[in-house]
Structures are given as C-alpha cells and as structure tokens.
Amino acid sequence: MSSEIEVVEEIQSNPKENGESSSKGIEEESLKNDVYTAAAYGDLEKLHRLVECEGSSVSEPDALGYYALQWSALNNRVAVAQYLIEHGGDVNATDHTGQTALHWSAVRGAIQVAELLLQEGARVDATDMYGYQATHVAAQYGQTAFLCHVVSKWNADPDVPDNDGRSPLHWAAYKGFADSIRLLLFLDAYRGRQDKEGCTPLHWAAIRGNLEACTVLVQAGKKEDLMITDKTGLTPAQLAAEKNHRQVSFFLGNARSLLEKRCDGSSPLGRLSKLGLAPVLWIMILLLLLVYTNSVVLASNLPKLTTGIGALAWLGFILATAGLFLFYRCSRKDPGYIRMNIHDPQTMKDDEPLLKIELNNPALLAGNWTQLCATCKIIRPLRAKHCSTCDRCVEQFDHHCPWVSNCVGKKNKWEFFLFLLLEVLAMLITGGVTLARVLSDPSAPSSFGAWMSHVASNHVGALSFLLVEFCLFFSVAVLTVIQASQISRNITTNEMANALRYSYLRGPGGRFRNPYDLGCRRNCSDFLVKGYNEDIECHEEDATQRPEGISMMQMQRNPNLQNGNGHVAIDVNPTHNSQSAHVHSANCSHSHNSKSKSDNVPLGLGLGLSRNPTRPVVSP
C-alpha cells in the first residue's frame, strides 16, 4: 500500500476555450468599485469614499464569503486594515471555512498586519474547519519570519496538531522548507509525532523526496526517528525507496546504519570509541621517537655524532616532543564549544515557555535561520557550526579531526597549527639526520645493491624510521600548507567546503567574497598573537536577496475558480496562469504522479494531506 501526500493544482482555464462568456461571475467593472478590491489593493482613498460617502459595509462578506479585512491581511495592507477595524471590521470574523484574517496574513507572511490584528484582539489560536491555526498556514508557505513572530511574541503554539494530527512541522517537512523546520525544531516541536496515518514529519519529507528537510530532521533527531513505522509498516527510508527517491533513501539508510553502529558513550566500549584515533597517533609518535633515539642518535653501529649533526638530531627530538605537548592540548582543550540552552524539565515551571527568543537578535532580523541550532537550542554565531560527532556547536568551526579526537575551532586552532608545523619541521630534521647518519657508515660497501643489503641487515631501525616518516611527511606537510593558507585569508576549512552554501561568503552578483579577510599580514599577526582571527561584521547588504516584504502587482478574481478552502485564485504575476490548490477530503481522491511535483507554492490555504490506499506500490 502506497503512502502519499497529494497536492493537486488546477490551472485557470481560458474562458474562450471553455466556451464561456465574459458575463460569468462578477463583472470586472463592479470589482473595481467594491470595498473588497479596494482593501486588496490598499486603495485607502477609494475605500474611504465607498464607506463614508456611499455607505458600503466593511463587516459583511463578499459574494464568495470573504471579508475585506481578509483581503487586506493577505496583501499586508496595514493602513487599510486599521481603517477597516476602526469602521466595524471584526478581527475574528470567519468565512465559510472558519478562516480569519490572521490565517490569510500567514499565507504571505504579512507580519505587520498580523501584529495589528493581534493587538486588536485577534485570536492567535483560531482554527478553521481543517484544524489549521495560523502556525500551520505559515509552515505550509514557508513563512519562517511570521512563525517566529507569532510564537515568540504572541505565544502561538508551534506544535499544535490539526484535525488529521499533523503539526506545523509535518507541513514544513512535506513542503521542504528547511528554515521553517529549523525554527520549529528550535522551538521544541515534537519530531516523533505521528498523524492519523502513523507518519512523522520525517516520513512526509521522505515521501516528497526533500533531501534538505530530511537532513535537518535527522541531524536534530535520534536513531529512533529513523525506525518509526507508519500504519503500513514502512520506515521513512522505505517510503523514499518506494517513491523512487534514491538519494533520500540512501541518505536515510546510511544515517540509520551509522547511528546503529555508534556505541553507547556510557559503556566501556563507547568510552573507548570516543577516544578516536588520538591514542593511535600518540603511540605512533612515541614509537617513532623511541626508534629514532635508539637506532639513529644513540646507535652503536654508526659513527659518533659530530657537534653539528648532534645539535640537529636533538633539535628534531625536542621539536617532536613539543609537538606532542601541543597535540595533547589540542585534543583535550575546549575547541570553542558554545553553551547549550537546554532546560531541565525537573526545574522548569509549568507556565514557563520552553524557549525564549530575542526578537531583536541580529540573526533573526537578518533572516539567517541557518544559525538556529535545533540540537543545542541556541542562535549560534555566523561562523559556528554544529559538529555531528561531538554533538556540540563550535565557534569558528574548522573541521572535526579524528586524529586528535576533537574539533578544531576558535580556541584550539592555534595549538593544532603549531602541532602540525612543529611535526613537519621535526620530520624534516630527523629524516635528514637519519639519512646523513646512514650514509656516513664507514663499514658500508660502495656498490648500491650491496649498500642496500647492508643497510637492511645492519640498520633496520633507521630504515624503518625513514620509510614511515616518508609516508607521513607529505600528508602532514600538505595539511600544514592548507591550514597556513587559510589562516592567511582568515577562512576555515568548513567555509571553504561550503562556500557556495553560505550566503555571507557571497558578494554582489553571487561571487565569492570573504568579509573577514583583513589582509595576509593582519590575519597572520592576529592568529599568532591572539591565537585566533577576529570576526568582522559584514554590513554590506546583498541587493539580490529577496526581501521578506509583501507586495502585490496585480489581482484578478474569478468567482468560479476557488480552492478547497474557499480562497479565490489571485494572479500576482500577470504573465503566468494563476493556480489554486485543492484540498483532499476524506471523500475525494485523485490520481497523482509522485515523481512530478511543483516547486511553486499554491496561493490558497488548502494544502490537504491525503493517503491514497488504492495506488499500487511503486518499486524503487
């Protein structure tokens, strides 16, 4: 049995093709002179004339059952909405589907109108006939800023289920709005909530094939989230495979395998696994130093050390030992963990909110929702990142190094770089000393073949030391050069790897731009003296970014074309056909190809979720 969310979009047809006359519905001329159109367009002067001179009512719905206040809310007409309220408009008036003006304001994220409505007494928890609150609608359309506003300032419930048991997180996961998912998880939305079909948000993201949504949910979740089955007995990975979303199926299956193999940190084996490869590297360096000392520096079958060679030999030993000390500090030091903001349920009061969000936080004002960490429950700095291995957010995250069993970040990158630098210098010196000592053996034969045989039989330790050092030197040297280059440009390994994803690394025109690069000399001096590079705020605005503001170019109303919730189709782009979404009720079904999905968000509020039990199972 197949599991599916269906969104059927109807394209507005041409009246000529259907043989319809221009007289169908309400005349266009009359539309231009009613309070509803004036409210939608924000024509306050015309609205004033219609209400105060012609006696038009603002408290009555139009022929389709919608209020003027709803139209003004949809298009963020604040002045018009204020006028309508002052002249009898009811902020809690509902249309035939139970929707209020607040529902309509959530469609396009009209925060200003929503704030006005709520200040005038609008119910933030008002539900329509489908159980949708404003938070559901905002999640359906990816209006993250709207969600943040009504939850943080007006205590809207970010995890309330609708009539089908689906929370805003279900909707955001299905629609693939990763930023909304981050915010909802940040607000402690329940990842494991199952709707009437037994589906969690991860199930719906998998069905739709939204890889980014699945990634955010998995990173913030646990192994159990991947193992939950719906009423058909399928996990998210199996549903993704059924829908032929192979990349999502592979990701979910691989994530489950990794989490299942991860040992419990409280067990002896788990504590041992947390040590990583640091003990291996530590033992390797100690063994190399031991072999170097016994088989090269103090070797009895080699000539006595001269003053110059002896000084170099012990300098290499000292550098390697100092590198070991820095290696220990790097592996044990706090790399820049950011304090987690997780409440203790036992000490929380019943009326205390799970999390308090600062509305004036620069990250939220700028719309940088990727700075929200759903695991640590913090708004992390711009250059910080959550490490999946350490399960903590790290300031100026560079990378997680398994060889030091720790992250490399703002507070330990100095030790990490100097450790690499000292070890490279030590390998150069000790390798050169070893080669010089072996070549100076007076008992060695002159022919190359005989000399090799002599070295292999009489200087096994020195030869082994040279071979191991040769293998290690190039990889460590390359890593050191890369780190030095990044330090000189004040950029991290993580930023280099994700330069195309991070908006703060893009300048005008989308080209790469590092706002933190103060020049090679300043970058290097800051790092060597302070131990880290400074973060410089980037005050330049990207003109190419789409604003959160609401605008409406043109509007057309067709009384015969409605969506399932009763919203009239609105054409905001006259060069494209308008669309409306059809709500699937329990009594209707439509065939739908899950492989072809529209990335456009329907303009109506009706985005009903439905399962089609009659569809055959699609094999991957």
UniProtKB/Swiss-Prot annotation:
Catalysed reaction equations from the record: L-cysteinyl-[protein] + hexadecanoyl-CoA = S-hexadecanoyl-L-cysteinyl-[protein] + CoA
Taxonomic superkingdom: Eukaryota
PROSITE patterns, per database record: ANK_REP_REGION (PS50297), ANK_REPEAT (PS50088), DHHC (PS50216)
Tissue specificity statement from the Swiss-Prot or TrEMBL entry: Expressed in root, leaf, inflorescence stem, pollen and floral tissue.
One of the record's GO cellular component terms: cytoplasmic vesicle membrane
Topology Cytoplasmic: residue spans: 1-276, 329-415, 483-620
Name this protein carries in UniProt: Protein S-acyltransferase 24
Source species of the chain: Arabidopsis thaliana (Mouse-ear cress)
